[in-house]
Amino acid sequence: MTRTTRRGHRFRRPAGAAALLLVGALALAGCGRDASSREPAAAGDTTGVTDTSIKVGATFPLTGVAAPGYSTIPKGAQAYFDYVNDNGGVYGRKIDYIVKDDAYNPTTTSSVTNELVLKDQVFAMLGALGTPTHEAVVDFLNSSKVPDIAVSSGSVTWGDDPKEHPWTFGWQTDYESEGKIIGKWIADNMPKARVGLFLQNDDFGASGEKGLRDYIDKQIVAVSKYTPGGTDVTPQIAALQAKKADLVVGFNVPSYTALSQLVAMKLNYKPQWFYTNVGSDPTLVGSLLANFSKGQVKNGAQLLDGVMSTAYLPDVSNTSNPWIQTFDKIWKSNGSGGALTNYELYGMSQAYMFVQALQATGKDLTREALVKTLEEKGGDFTGPVFAPYRYSADSHLGTSGMKVVKIEGGQVKDVTGVETTDIGDADITESSESESTPPADGIPPAE
Amino acid sequence: MTAVKRVWGIPLVRHLVIGVVALVVVLFVLSSLSPFRNAQMATMAYLAIAAGGLTVLTGLSGQLSLGHGAFLAVGAYTTAYLLKDPDPPLPLVVIMLVSVAVALVVGGVVGVAAARLKGPYVAGATLALAVAVPALVRYLHGFGQEQGLHVIVPDVPRWFTDIVWQITGVDVDPVSYVAYLGWIALIVTFILLANLMRSRTGRTWRALRDNDVAAEIAGITLGRSRVLAFVMSTAAAGLAGSLMALSVRVAAPSGFPVDLSLTLLSAVVLGGLGSLTGALLGSALLTFLPQAVTNWGSSAGLSDVQSAELAPVVYGLIMMAVILLAPAGVVGSLRHAWQRRRGLA
Amino acid sequence: MQQFWTTLLGGLTLGAVYAAFALALCLIWRSTRVVNFAQAPMAMVTTYVGLEVIDSTGSYWLGFVVALAAGLVLGAVVERGLVRFVEGKSDLNVVILTLGLFVVLHSLAAIVFGQDYKSFPAPFSLQGLHVGGHNLAITGFGVFTLIAVAVVFVLLVALFRFTDLGLKMRASAFSPEVARLLGVRVGKMLTLGWALAAVVGSLAGLLVAGGSLVFPQFMDSVVVYGFVAAVLGGLDSPAGSVVGGLVLGLALSFVSGYAASDLVPITALGILVLVLLVRPGGLFSHVAERRV
């Protein structure tokens, strides 16, 4: 969909002198049209970029139902950018990171994104969170030609069609690919299992189910869906128990991992649990469950023992991983206190990839150049993610694969190597790439 | 002079004249604003339309609805459904009218049920409605579930651009187009509502609000008047929802939380119950205040999360302060002060 | 069959929580003729206070008592400091005042206590009870919830039916002028009504939170369904609140387990509309609508 501006009008004259006077008076009184209407230079659009700074915008749920957990992601990004800025910035430019709250409400996302793009004049958006929320602004960002990098959501919408949304790039492994990788692992390793699905009632659950059914359609005996923020999930888990599912795959958020574990304990229901990457977070869920042991859950921390999951990033509990060590050091020097969490790690990893793209783009930073860099070089970027990003001219999807892991004693242990795949009928292959190590100072080198 | 005064005394004439003047002023103001301010003006327009409708319902007929967000959802989804393809089946104005009609019908059904109930029971039922409608569209197929429906705003019609250009000398871009639409709709709605409030129907409503038993003895059919007020307010909410879909560009369940209904109610309260000017003022506050407060919070050194939470704190406090200190609302209190001064002089 | 019983028991405990919340609304309605929309955020705040105490002392019961006491104080403070000034004015003013308080408390709690999930311990086992080799889908805490609601119900009925105080409270709410003439200290009664209601509200908060997660929005679904339960039963009747809560809890549990979780809100609306169309004053409205 293209919109044409009709320049012909500029040569016409408005109706009367009185009208002109009024326009003048009102323009003086109100805030006149500002720099937003300026024409980009021939070399490309440098909105938001000066010799000393780059303005980057982000929208996250800082308030409301989605805020617990997600509101800490931008703290991670902020810490990383502060660290980069303390070390001289990128080509001498400091990153000015502006976070706005959208309360996970598309209406608010729309208004704060307007504010970021039209008023604050950001160079790019980074890590804007949520499927329905970002859906509200993706057309606006693309028609305004604002780079929309690393959307914080695993929907395939963010990158499967670069022709439709040439300025939008995904980041994490999409839910469909994750479903496929989990499905294949189950088909290979637990072919007799009666699989029950515990799904969040939205695109997250639906894409996951689609991917799973590519491999274990016949093994699925029950599907239960919950609405986040709704009533108690006892009836959902009871339905899975009634169908005698002995392996439950959960496409749910971390709070519902804790809640489903508590319900299962109440029902004396002990299937093998397999939570997706989004829902597992052993540090968060484990600490939530461990706190109950002060009450009467005797084995709170061990509740998660033996739970399967997937990972596209190292877990913060894996302190021997060099990326975790590097990010932990940065968090200690520039973070906002407390131990590094997986949410903050997520934000830092996005920020790292963004700085990587800025470094690779070079000194002459424009919006067009940044997108060109990601399409041409983004596929070769190495970082904390296990598998490469799928960035190219044909796909803007994020990292392409994950490991199957198991939680043991609060630690995440690898079960498989890195499995990579893509949406649609792409096969799953074991990645041969060796794990990368971070640069010594934690900042991707300039080219 | 007396002739002019007499004509001015006819509410319809007065409202139409004010409407035309307002239209011209609005055209000039919008054309002089930046795209960001235009987007905010669009938000203010749909909030004001919904608040205007709620003013009639709550301020005039004394019924409390905690679920008007549901009717915005009805209007928004109708518009989104008709605008999900690049080639809309109907002209935009017709789509907006269809949205009003659908909200009107749904409002009629709910209104008939609500008219039988007293205060807290209406509140309970409408609160349940505010939660039920978003959940229902999530459940039904064809409405895009959680992601909602994408709204493709039709291109600005050439004749529209021409007219605006002729008057103001400024081009119409897609963002300001929605703002123009919103404010034109707002002016039309407010003229209609203002006339209604001045009419016999309006007086009936006030009588009902102040003393329903006496009103009934005086021969007013309680039920019919209540339903009419309800339907009028839901029609306004439907129009507001339609404009909301156009300005947000998506209609998704998460866009219609219970907070939305409470927000609308607070817009009515902030300005003053029963006054359309108050509704306008209240929606202006709701549009511009959160951003100002949040920015003030971050510049005062609060964390992002804290400054984001600050906006609701401030508007909740203002809401309480208005009720405690100036129950007639800002507009009502100013009017009283003005009348007192004139009385003294 | 097992699924049926599990869903039934789940619905009962869920319903008991709604009933507790509805009882708080009913209490305040009986003693002041006001619907307190800030009930849930007030309970949320007191639950957080309780959690702070539990976390620092390690004693659940101390936290429990402190939370209830905090409710008593908060209720009285809100009545004395805010509601007092709009009493006798239009009903709408009080409603809007409590809605304003709703918004403020919600955000203040997020600022003061943070946005994170916190786990709220329970004093009893969170495992299903074992009876004769069978696992019952109800925890020790679930049983506690049911008993707590029953006790509150009995106390409330006793208060209004058998004590002088209850009579005075009702009289103050129903007709302040007459009550004043009869020597009732109306102001004190209203304060007491708010304070007691807030205690019951705090209890509801503790029952929702126990053995589950606490965050500033954790009472949100109770706001709607607890209110619906109260209205369903007829705001004026404690028995109605309990029945309304249990009916709603069971219905929502079965719809959620056997149909779809997205149909839960529309079911609540459907039940409410159906009941109100037959009995506009709720299930247990025995008094005909008051006429002037």
Please provide the spans of the model-predicted regions.
Chain A
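Short, low-complexity disordered leader/linker segments with a strong preference
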Residues: 1-55, 430-447
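Immediate post-signal peptide segment of exported/extracytoplasmic ligand-binding proteins
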Residues: 38-58, 89-94, 187-193, 364
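Beta-alpha junction/loop-to-helix N-cap segments that form part of ligand/metal-binding clefts
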Residues: 40-44, 68-75, 87-161, 171, ...
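Periplasmic-binding protein-like
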Residues: 116-129, 147-151, 195-199, 244-254, ...
